[in-house]
Amino acid sequence: MFDILMYLFETYIQNESEAMVDHELLTDELTRAGFHQDEIYKALNWLEKLTALQDTDAYPYLTRVGSKSVRIYTSEEMQLLDTPSRGFILFLEQVNVLDFTTREMVIDRVMELDTKYFSMDDLKWVILMVLFNVPGKESAYSQLEDLIFEEQEGPLH
């Protein structure tokens, strides 16, 4: 499912393509690209739920809390998000790339992935997808993109 999400994000979402509107055409294209139909439906459902997370009435855990609050991860979350991943999320909060709401959206979307192994690179992509889909987070999205691409280039000597 994550491969499909990556494909969709790189091919359609970042390019703001209109193909995302017609699920049937998109499903046909993804099937022709070699993806299995059940995984396609899971990925599309994942994206729909990401959009639905912006409705805070339906998701009470996305209500505003004080800036001094500390996130306590569940055992299930800690199994999927290792210590470096949780540290990266905390770092992004400290540099104001993520706020309480977007952090919870990221954790929610990570936990909905159908996977037992989740890498730091996977986490970065999920965070990019969340920030891209939240209105008003364009600056945070750009900031994270800069962090990711600067990290990949390495230090200059």
Curated annotation (Swiss-Prot):
NCBIfam families, per the entry: PRK03430.1 (NF002897)
Gene name, Swiss-Prot/TrEMBL: smg
Domain of life: Bacteria
Homology family: Belongs to the Smg family.
Alphabetized PANTHER family for the sequence: PROTEIN SMG
Protein name in the entry: Protein Smg homolog
InterPro entries, per database record: Smg
Organism of origin: Colwellia psychrerythraea (strain 34H / ATCC BAA-681)
